[in-house]
């Protein structure tokens, strides 16, 4: 699926790659599976083995002609030995990007929900051995707490193997080209388009809230990796800087999205990639896939 339509908003999807993961990697899920079979199969788990499709994909949104790219995937030619599916990729992501009808030159803004390797890779591409910004006319929005988290030269830097080399090949070249705007966690980038804090998965992880002609949606990055986390916010895939804060963030997002009646588009969900959240019994929430 290349285009998602929600209210007056069209969102183009640029797929990079996918893997299959076991639902059990999220934590104890047997009871939840029993309660949510009606929407879980076959899109969000395979009935034969309870594996789910985990996508790497980016979003392009056009708000009154202002074009924003959200979470530009992992990128080609990166040294990512700790994550083999992203190591030294050579994939036609840029060709798929152009197939949406948008060119990189047409992009006004790039927003990375956080600076993990799979959310900022295509910030840059390699030309003649140098990393250069992929979107030459865009302003790249980086949240200040997230830049502090991942700059290896920042005081107290905590290294993690899965994010080695990312700052040098995907962030620093954008800073040096003068295309970056380092902004607070609550920041408006265009009318109706606002960065909002959603910390926990990483120190400065944020989401993007869009409110356009009465349609409200949230690009929630890695606040959720699988829709079952809507019903049990303690489930997680690991790799959180602050797991307790990540849970609190999920709970807050669930109640906000449910009470607004808005849609959310996480970074990694399988088709239809987006959905709503409704209140369910005992203060729990329930995911409703787009189109249901
Ligand atoms: Zn991710």
Predicted segments, located by residue:
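Metallo-beta-lactamase
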Residues: 1-102, 106-118, 134-197, 215-221, 245-261
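Metal-dependent catalytic neighborhoods of phosphoester/phosphodiester hydrolases
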Residues: 120-130, 276-277
């Amino acid at each position: 699926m290349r285009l998602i339509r929600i209210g007056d908003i069209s969102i183009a999807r640029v797929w990079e790659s996918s893997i299959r993961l076991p639902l059990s990697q999220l934590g104890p899920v047997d009871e939840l599976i029993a309660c949510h079979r009606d929407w879980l199969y076959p899109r969000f788990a395979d009935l034969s083995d309870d594996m789910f499709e985990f996508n790497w994909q980016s979003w392009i949104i056009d708000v009154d002609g202002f074009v924003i790219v959200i979470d530009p995937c992992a990128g080609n030619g990166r040294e990512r030995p700790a994550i083999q599916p992203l190591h030294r990729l050579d994939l036609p992501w840029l060709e798929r990007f152009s197939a949406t009808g948008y060119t990189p030159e047409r992009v006004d803004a790039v927003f990375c929900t956080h600076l993990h390797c799979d959310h900022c890779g295509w910030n840059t591409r390699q030309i003649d051995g140098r990393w250069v910004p992929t979107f030459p006319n865009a302003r790249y929005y980086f949240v200040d707490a997230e830049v502090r988290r991942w700059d290896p030269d920042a005081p107290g830097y905590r290294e993690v193997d899965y994010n080695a080399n990312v700052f040098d090949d995907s962030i620093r070249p954008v800073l040096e080209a003068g295309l970056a705007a380092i902004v607070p966690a609550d920041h408006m980038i265009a009318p109706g388009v606002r960065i909002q804090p959603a910390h926990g998965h990483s120190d400065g992880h944020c989401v993007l809230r869009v409110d356009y002609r009465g349609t409200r949606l949230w690009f929630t990055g890695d606040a959720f990796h699988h829709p079952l986390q809507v019903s049990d916010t303690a489930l997680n895939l690991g790799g959180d800087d602050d797991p307790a804060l990540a849970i609190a963030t999920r709970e807050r997002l669930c109640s906000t999205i449910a009470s607004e009646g808005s849609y959310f588009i996480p970074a990694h969900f399988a088709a239809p990639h987006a959905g709503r959240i409704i209140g369910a019994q005992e203060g729990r929430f329930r995911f409703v896939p787009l189109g249901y």
